Design a protein with these regions (language model features):
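Conserved active-site regions of diverse hydrolases
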Residues: 3, 23-346, 353-362
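Short, glycine/charged-enriched secondary-structure capping and boundary segments
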Residues: 11, 15, 46-49, 142-146, ...
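A short hydrophobic/aromatic micro-motif that marks alpha-helical segments and, especially, helix-coil
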Residues: 18, 310-311, 606
Length: 621
């Protein structure tokens, strides 16, 4: 296959495509890159001219590569290793054979250089990015004409990449972004060479990717967190519908035929080592900078794509958190009935509606999310003896959640529970158990890819089971009563694994989740009783301290539908300790009918905020 060569006589550029900014990401402590020109942050440009004030990339300069864009989105700087940075990639580098006459390190040597500087250890909290293989193929097509020899060489190069990934894991790495090969047959260089070159480029890319994917499957099974990036599929999607992604040209280079993008800059620019120039705006509308390398806009799009994959487990993690709010509203209504039992209330039926505004704060692993929650609880309570009562209830909850930036989910929770209360003098104690089924619909993950907004949708099922013990003591002072209370509640929420409906490059699957909760509550309650005409009014207030012993960081496993490889990342992490406050007013309208209006709020919680209003009626027999 013919290739675009660097006119400065030294380098064969042999790579294809690469291509929200946040504070430093809490999931990772650094980003390290190994690869070729698709990820080269300036190493080759410094070989060509060590005096360069600004390093140049294989793109429409002064753009950045996809790997750099990923590092930036995570809050890190990825600079060339020749400047002391963590981007070891060199244009022309391969896994087995380089495709350049420049004195550069191949990709395995890049890893060895890094390990030599770290004492042979890879950092388990560092995110590694690996992208290569194209130069091996370019070397093979320049050296051989036998298709079988070329295919065998491509397979050997892919096996060398798998070996490198295994060596990274053996050195201690836990997280690696692995880019597969884009479709070489879709590059301007292949298009210009004719139909045979296009077909051959596509086929050899598939040979490489198939071997790589087999290795990825094995490495994922051995515990390496591989974040798969299907550039082959994504670039084909762009080529099939360029305008949707914001491109007007996907077949010719922005820098011109025969150009090399590492020495290509904007029209009229006199700074830098620029031998070629691209027209104004072409860096944003052309898919390719030169015969095989992506433009600035393409690199930006690829960075968005990678970040959508990395962030996806955080979106999914909120699903297992959501039912706890419905359970809390339900059990709050039930505990109020148990309090009434502690005062010797009659057999009755009751209904309560709770409207809650829930806000999950943004974290490095999950998005800011708002949820409007409505819960209806209906039940019946029977007075067995003067001191013993019990009841059953059913709860239907509907939550509509929206992620910041778009997307969200709907939760329908249907629960049943039973409870029993014993009271004697000023003391009371009770217990309850609950079980519920959850249905998540309209799960939507919104992804920005250049100008294109893609919505990945899914649905999932789940369930929860739990129970609690509560008790307290009343001190009576005429028309006032007050006293302490304590509750211990255990819940287990399970969400079944699910896959998004799409078959495109960004559609993903997510593993089964389990969120355990063990909340201890200590509080103080105050209640008054005053007659207002024919109505008995009972204002109340309570404040409580809560601690969830199981509110630990929880990882969600995910992967692409279209490519092997899986990874587990921590998503939403709830606070372990928070406060709650409740105030309200109940009224006895007749001997049989009473009602209440109340407010419940959550405070001193660094992970979420919750405010709700509840209203209810009960009818005694």
């Amino acid at each position: 296959m013919p290739r675009t060569r660097l006119i400065v006589g030294a380098i064969t550029s042999a790579l294809l495509f690469s291509s929200h900014a946040f504070a430093a990401d809490q999931r990772f402590n650094n980003v390290v890159v190994f690869g070729d020109s698709l990820s080269d942050a300036g190493n080759v440009s410094l070989i060509l001219d060590p005096a360069l004030q600004t390093t140049q990339r294989f793109t429409t300069n002064p753009g950045s590569t996809a790997a750099e864009n990923v590092a930036k989105a995570l809050g890190f700087s990825s600079t060339a290793s020749k400047l002391g940075g963590t981007d070891y990639a060199y244009g022309g580098a391969g896994f087995v054979n380089n495709a350049t006459t420049l004195p550069i390190e191949n990709i395995p040597q890049q890893l060895q250089q890094y390990l030599a500087a770290t004492g042979g250890k890879a950092d388990p909290r560092t995110l590694y990015q690996v992208w290569g293989g194209a130069n091996d193929i370019f070397y093979l097509t320049d050296t051989y004409t036998d298709a079988n020899v070329i295919a065998a060489g491509a397979a050997a190069a892919a096996q060398a990449e798998v070996k490198l990934l295994g060596n990274l894991q053996a050195a201690g790495a836990k997280y690696v972004v692995v880019y597969n090969l884009p479709d070489i047959g879709k590059t301007p260089e292949s298009i210009a060479a004719g139909a045979a070159a296009q077909s051959g480029g596509t086929q050899i890319s598939l040979v490489y990717n198939n071997v790589l994917q087999t290795g990825i499957t094995q490495l994922s099974g051995s515990g390496l967190n591989i974040i798969p990036v299907n550039t082959f599929a994504l670039i084909n999607e762009v080529v099939a519908n360029p305008s949707a992604f914001g491109f007007t040209n996907v077949t010719t280079p922005a820098c011109g035929a025969g150009s090399s993008s590492v020495v290509c800059g904007p029209a009229g620019s006199t700074s830098g080592l620029y031998l070629y120039h691209y027209p104004a705006g072409a860096d944003q509308t052309y898919l390719f900078a030169d015969g095989v390398h992506p433009s600035t806009a393409a690199d930006a799009m690829l960075g968005q794509y990678v970040m959508s994959i990395i962030n996806a487990p955080g979106y999914a993690s909120l699903l297992a958190e959501a039912p706890l709010a419905s359970i809390s509203a339900q059990n709050r209504a039930i505990r109020n009935q148990m309090l009434a039992d502690g005062q010797g209330s009659d057999t009755r039926v009751f209904a309560s509606i709770d409207y809650g505004d829930q806000r999950f704060d943004a974290m490095s692993g999950s998005p800011k999310t708002t949820s409007n929650n409505v819960n209806l609880t209906i039940g019946a309570d029977v007075r067995f003896t003067d001191n013993l009562s019990g009841g059953v209830a059913m709860n239907v909850g509907q939550h509509n959640a929206d992620y910041s930036g778009g997307g969200g989910y709907k939760l329908q929770d249907i629960s049943g529970l039973g409870y029993v209360t014993y009271h004697q003098g000023g003391g009371y104690i009770g217990g309850y158990v609950d079980f519920g089924q959850d249905n998540f619909s309209d799960i939507e993950r919104r992804i920005q890819l250049g100008n294109y907004v893609r919505n990945e949708t899914a649905k999932a099922d789940g369930n929860h089971m739990g129970g609690g013990v509560t008790g307290g003591w009343w001190f009576d002072f005429s028309s006032l009563r007050t006293g302490p209370f304590a509750t211990v509640e255990w819940q287990t929420v399970k969400v079944d694994g699910y896959s998004e409906n799409g078959i495109d490059s960004s559609a993903m699957w997510f593993s089964r989740q389990q969120r355990d909760s063990l909340v201890s509550t200590l509080g103080w309650r105050l209640e008054g009783h005053w007659q207002a005409g024919n109505t008995m009014l009972s204002p109340y207030a309570e404040i409580a301290w809560n601690h969830d012993d199981k509110a630990d960081p929880r990882a969600v496993t995910a992967g692409l539908n279209s490519m092997p490889g899986s990874f587990s990342l921590v998503g939403f992490t709830p606070d372990k300790t928070w406060g709650t406050a409740d105030v309200g007013l109940s009224a006895q309208f007749t001997q049989a009918l009473s009602g209440w209006l109340g407010y419940s709020g959550r405070f001193s919680d660094n992970s979420q905020k919750y405010n709700s209003v509840n209203v209810g009626l009960k009818y005694a027999f």
